[in-house]
Amino acid sequence: MPLLLLGETEPLKLERDCRSPVDPWAAASPDLALACLCHCQDLSSGAFPDRGVLGGVLFPTVEMVIKVFVATSSGSIAIRKKQQEVVGFLEANKIDFKELDIAGDEDNRRWMRENVPGEKKPQNGIPLPPQIFNEEQYCGDFDSFFSAKEENIIYSFLGLAPPPDSKGSEKAEEGGETEAQKEGSEDVGNLPEAQEKNEEEGETATEETEEIAMEGAEGEAEEEEETAEGEEPGEDEDS
């Protein structure tokens, strides 16, 4: 009888708690009853906006976004050309970026002007687009971008880690190999120079030796002539 009463009253209690009713035979086993109740719990992200599917805390993924401030309606051909070059380069290299127009959005214009460092602003204090940021970190203007691109340090300029197969890493490796080859070539090139120098020094020493020998021979000849001249008067006196 107690089992029957439990079976009759348990469905009512479960319905009141917004849980599915269980069979009378399952109510006798607490493990089965709990197993039947668990499937009604809503574990979706909507029910737990700050938690994961299993109720764990969600940690936001930090993703750096490159911001390029442009003026789409600029009347300057030079500015439009610079903007197109920056945007085209980022697209060609599959670098994610966000294009922000300052011509039609006062907030974008104000934010750009306030976040460009003072030493990077022109004399009138109004920086011209394109201006490049990594989130809130200032990267530079077009001139800085162009220099970084020419030196192949664009990822460092943007504050991004270069991909493994990027041209920057390849250029660094090639640069190291080129420097090593250049040093080796310089060492090899120095050998003939050293040999030539030694040969020149040897020739110079030989010439000096020959000159000294010639001078010595001339000196001896002069002494012999003087001796001969000194002997001739004596012979005349004897005769």
From Swiss-Prot:
Tissue and organ distribution: Expressed in heart and skeletal muscle.
Gene Ontology CC entries for this record: cytoplasm
Keyword Cytoplasm on entry: no
Sequence similarity: Belongs to the SH3BGR family.
Source organism: Homo sapiens
Biased composition annotated in UniProt, kind: Acidic residues: 198-239
Stored CDD domains: GRX_SH3BGR
Disordered: annotated span: 159-239
InterPro entries tied to this protein: Glut_rich_SH3-bd, SH3BGR, Thioredoxin-like_sf
Transmembrane segments: none
GO molecular function, one term: SH3 domain binding
Compositional bias ranges of the Basic and acidic residues kind: 167-185
Entry keywords, A to Z: SH3-binding
Protein name as it appears in the record: SH3 domain-binding glutamic acid-rich protein
A Pfam entry, by short name: SH3BGR
